[in-house]
Amino acid sequence: VQEASARSILQLKGVRKTFGEFVAVDRVDLDVAEGEFFTIVGPSGSGKTTLLRMLAGMETPSDGDILLRGQRINELPSNRRPTCLVFQSLALFPHRTVGQNIEFPLKMKGVAAEVRRRRAHDLMRMVRLPESYYAKSVKLCSGGERQRVALARAFAYDPEILFFDEPLSAIDYKLRKALEKELKDIHKETGKTFMYITHSLEEAMVMSDRIGVMRDGRLVQVGTPEDIYTRPRDRFVSEFMGDVNVIAVRPNGGGLLEGVDLPGRFRVAGAADRNGHVVIRPEFLRFVASEAEADNSLRGIVYNEYALGSRLQYQVRVGEKVLVVERTRRDAWRGGLDEPVLVGWDAGDAMFIPD
């Protein structure tokens, strides 16, 4: 599902995990580059957490190989791997201070107290924690502060790879958005390899160098956020990665596609001479005054409008089907609800996915 990298730090070759008759992870091949921020997304039950647990040494593959810098580590215990896992629950010591939590890995290694203290302060600065928090009880920290403590403690292990299991899921939206940017900045500053599991598509798109999409235990597509979003391999990926309009089509000759569930003929870049679906993201649809303003167009009725902060989303009924159109406030629909409208899009803004 991807090209191998010359800077590979982590490789998965046909990795499989079964629990009795249930196949949780099904022959995954993956190559992660050193210093990469790689995120795995997928619906519940897709196998992403089981895959992460195998990488972290908490589960052993039923088949296949996990290689770290070319060395097989399938049976290597988690405490002997140069990796660290940041849990969703954070797993901090609530009865200890911020400094004691961060210093814990260093204390276990026998590092002198003064060296531990200096290192803890260095890590606190890196994760944007005030140095005055060194003696603060973790119990008195906010959710965002505890997240920073957990991250600082993970770096205290000096791991080659940091694994993250949905660490921001329990944090409120505004703070989560701030932490996304900070985590990306920290990744860039340290040059460490990050592997991140999340159900949040926004997190994946904002932070990742590449994204892997899982479904039913399989890694179905790997690519940059731009690739995954604008060039999905199949209909599942297109719909999983965000709102999308899907039109069933069949070939009509002359490079055109004829709508099966909508009237009209459409021109789509890269369309094949076979049945399939035209997929268009809502932001690529626009309101036009005439058919000459776009490669493709459909007439419908605007029947709902939703405010999404800086953007507006419209539902346009075309026959028995509903199209979703998303525009900036500057490009908003100037008419009212239940009024006729012409929705257009260009050939290069749609994707053809064959059946």
For each feature predicted by the language model, list its residue ranges:
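The feature captures the beta-strand-to-loop junction immediately N-terminal to the Walker
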Residues: 41-43
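Conserved ABC ATPase "signature" region
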Residues: 72-74, 114-132, 139, 184-185
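Non-catalytic connector elements of ABC transporters
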Residues: 244-246, 255-355
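Conserved catalytic motifs of ABC-family nucleotide-binding domains
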Residues: 158
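Catalytic Walker B motif of ABC-type/P-loop ATPase nucleotide-binding domains
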Residues: 162-166
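Short helical segment in ABC ATPase nucleotide-binding domains corresponding to the A-loop/adjacent helical element
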Residues: 99-107, 117, 121
